[in-house]
């Protein structure tokens, strides 16, 4: 299921709403954030599955007292408002259960459970927020692998072991990439990659004391090699191997990892992409190599106005910085331990799209408001920052938003797919004026006047309008291969 910034409808359900308002929501049918249950005389056990599912996904509302007739296709006829017989007792029973041992944690406040009534019909609403990543998973019973649920358009489903493991890992304040990989040593480091990194490091940090260290000691300082003081184990960390390792050891330990860059700037019916970088046996497919091979190609067509700072030429703009920042964010926030870890960049004439494995730690609307969480891979973040790539912690996405706003472009679109467990950031270089012009166009009368070149804005219209509508309600928010067969993992 995809989530974007405007996914806040379930938070509109409150104790002050009218019966007719709630009825309208019910008549639109169940959705990823709305679950209806009959619940005539007691709280159904399935309520706690939905509670877990909403808390572990994007939040939502459970409405008790609604019967579903699955034979009817029209939602207005499918969902019948029957009401509950004793709402006071039902609410009391729910609170007693949720605060007992039924679930591992109660995340609700008093105002999250309320009744909405009219005449002789009373419905009970349970509003479940998305839980903090430091507290997930929320599960039934005492076994997270049996009692953890997530949510999609079809309802609640048992979370996979990979999804549960991912939630448990996200609770670790130290991140993922400090994990010592047993039996992986300095022999698994690609010397050329590390040498290239150290050369950049020395140029940027000319008098740094680390420049005199041997490779092992240097990696120790960066978090790429570690010794566990408790048991004496030592070896490469996940950060060290993924950033600087040889391709074969990486593919052995992380067979789930797939890196893919595609340029779709010049495409035809027969050619899906005009340039591509993915593993082809000609380069050691570690993250630093991927970053340094892709970045020049990704930025090659951007305008570079001639400017001087003193006698030094400045040949990149804030847009270059924002796109590179998006690349860094993709690397440092990725969950490389998911069952499918795809790092994908798609370049088009007017957009860049970055996809990484793992769900967001924070709700999307919080991220747009400036909220930030620690990256999953803080050592990788340090490695990139020490050679000039990546802003300080928490400032990357706000910087991208500010730069796109300064250029008058459509708001960057951050999307979370909680079924594929991946996040996508799309940076579209189309002006808001173009979006508004298309939106105001009378398609029936002026269809022929709209040129094919302008049709490129169609795909961002809905996204932009959704984001704009939310801003009105929330003003405070401020190997390089050519045309070969595609081997996408999807």
Each model region followed by its residue ranges:
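Conserved N-terminal catalytic/coupling substructures associated with nucleotide/phosphate chemistry
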Residues: 1-319, 328-441, 450-453
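Conserved N-box helix within the HATPase_c
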Residues: 322
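Active-site alpha-helix of zinc metalloproteases
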Residues: 325
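Asp/Glu-rich intrinsically disordered low-complexity tracts
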Residues: 436-444, 454, 461-480, 484-490
């Amino acid at each position: 299921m995809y989530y974007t910034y405007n996914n806040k409808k379930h938070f509109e359900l409150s104790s002050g709403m009218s019966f007719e308002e709630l009825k309208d929501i019910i008549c639109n049918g169940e959705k990823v954030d709305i679950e209806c249950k009959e619940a005539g005389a007691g709280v159904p056990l399935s309520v706690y599955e939905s509670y877990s599912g909403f808390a572990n996904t994007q939040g939502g509302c459970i409405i008790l007292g609604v019967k579903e007739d699955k034979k009817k296709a029209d939602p207005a006829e499918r969902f019948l408002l029957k009401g509950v017989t004793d709402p006071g007792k039902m609410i009391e029973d729910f609170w007693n259960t949720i605060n007992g041992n039924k679930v591992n944690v109660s995340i609700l406040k008093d105002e999250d459970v309320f009744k909405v009534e009219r005449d002789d019909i009373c419905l009970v609403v349970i509003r479940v927020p998305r839980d903090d990543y430091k507290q997930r998973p929320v599960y039934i019973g005492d076994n997270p692998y049996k009692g953890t649920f997530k949510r999609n358009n079809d309802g609640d489903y048992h979370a996979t072991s990979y999804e549960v493991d991912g939630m448990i890992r996200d609770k670790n304040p130290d991140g993922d990439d400090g994990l010592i990989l047993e039996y992986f040593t300095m022999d698994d480091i690609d010397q050329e990659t590390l040498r290239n990194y150290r050369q950049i490091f020395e140029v940027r940090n000319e008098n740094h004391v680390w420049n005199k260290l041997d490779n092992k000691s240097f990696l120790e300082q960066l978090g790429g090699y570690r010794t566990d003081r408790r048991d004496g184990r030592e070896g490469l960390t996940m950060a060290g191997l993924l950033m600087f390792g040889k391709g074969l050891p990486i593919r052995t330990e992380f067979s789930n990892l797939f890196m893919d860059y595609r340029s779709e700037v010049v495409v035809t019916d027969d050619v899906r992409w005009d340039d591509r970088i993915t593993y082809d046996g000609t380069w050691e497919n570690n993250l630093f190599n991927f970053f340094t091979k892709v970045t020049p190609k990704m930025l090659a067509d951007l305008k570079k106005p001639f400017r001087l700072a003193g006698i030094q030429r400045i040949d990149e703009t804030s847009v270059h910085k924002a796109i590179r920042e998006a690349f860094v964010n993709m690397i440092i926030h990725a969950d490389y331990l998911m069952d499918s870890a795809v790092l994908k960049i798609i370049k088009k004439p007017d957009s860049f799209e970055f996809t990484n494995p793992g769900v967001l730690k924070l709700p999307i609307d919080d991220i747009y408001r400036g909220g930030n969480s620690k990256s999953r891979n803080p050592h990788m973040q340090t490695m990139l920052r020490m050679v000039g790539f990546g802003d300080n912690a928490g400032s990357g996405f706000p910087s991208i938003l500010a730069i796109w706003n300064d250029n008058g472009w459509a708001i960057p679109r951050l999307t979370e797919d909680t079924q594929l467990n991946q996040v996508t950031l799309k940076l579209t270089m189309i002006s808001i004026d173009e979006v508004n012009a298309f939106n105001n166009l009378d398609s029936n009368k002026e269809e022929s006047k709209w040129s094919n070149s302008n049709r490129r804005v169609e795909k961002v219209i809905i996204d932009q309008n959704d984001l704009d509508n939310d801003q009105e309600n929330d003003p405070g928010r401020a190997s390089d291969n050519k045309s070969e067969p595609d081997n996408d993992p999807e």
